Amino acid sequence: MKSSMAILLVMALIIFTLDKNYSTAKDLPSCEKGIHRKVTCKQCNKRSDNDDDYTKCCNSFDAFLMCGFLLSKES
């Protein structure tokens, strides 16, 4: 039983490492290609009433993360 748990743990670690290496923030679609990002940026823009926030959210992954974090705190 312990050996099968160890094997599963090693497999999970390998899968996590491969996933992390092959999917980066740059791979995420911009607002033109990604519906989730577009919706999140629009909601953030409605909260701030500043069109510049929408543009920043669409073009910068860090701004997108901050916007999503702020929206999650409101819920």
Curated annotation (Swiss-Prot):
Residues 1-23 form the signal peptide. The keyword Methyltransferase does not apply. Gene3D superfamilies: 1.10.60.50. Contains 3 disulfide bonds. It comes from the Eukaryota. GO terms for cellular component: extracellular region. Disulfide bonds: none annotated. Keywords: Disulfide bond, Ion channel impairing toxin, Neurotoxin, Potassium channel impairing toxin, Secreted, Signal, Toxin, Voltage-gated potassium channel impairing toxin. It is found in: Secreted. Expressed by the venom gland. Belongs to the scoloptoxin-03 family. This is Kappa-scoloptoxin(03)-Ssm1e. It comes from Scolopendra mutilans. The lineage of its organism: Eukaryota, Metazoa, Ecdysozoa, Arthropoda, Myriapoda.
